[in-house]
Amino acid sequence: GKVWDWIKSAAKKIWSSEPVSQLKGQVLNAAKNYVAEKIGATPT
């Protein structure tokens, strides 16, 4: 329905907004570093 369409488009806007993009990048980097530490490798 209409409400669902609105929710989806709002979620898409939020998901691709700048603060969220930066946050996603930080989380990805943290995860990569964590895994690298666990397996004893340096992230590239």
Swiss-Prot record:
Q: In which tissues is it expressed?
A: Expressed by the venom gland.
Q: Name one GO cellular component term.
A: extracellular region
Where is this protein found?
Secreted; Target cell membrane
Keywords for this entry? Antibiotic, Antimicrobial, Ion transport, Membrane, Secreted, Target cell membrane, Target membrane, Transmembrane, Transport
Q: What is its main location?
A: secreted
Gene Ontology biological process terms, A to Z:
defense response to bacterium; hemolysis in another organism; monoatomic ion transport
Q: Which domain of life is it from?
A: Eukaryota
Q: What does this protein do?
A: Disrupts cell membranes through formation of pores. Strong antimicrobial activity against Gram-positive bacteria B.subtilis, S.epidermidis, E.faecalis and S.aureus. Less active against Gram-negative bacteria P.aeruginosa and E.coli. Has no antifungal or hemolytic activity.
| Similarity annotation | Belongs to the non-disulfide-bridged peptide (NDBP) superfamily. Long chain multifunctional peptide (group 2) family.
Q: What is this protein called?
A: Pandinin-1
**Species per Swiss-Prot/TrEMBL record:** Pandinus imperator (Emperor scorpion)
What lineage does UniProt assign to this protein's organism?
Eukaryota, Metazoa, Ecdysozoa, Arthropoda, Chelicerata
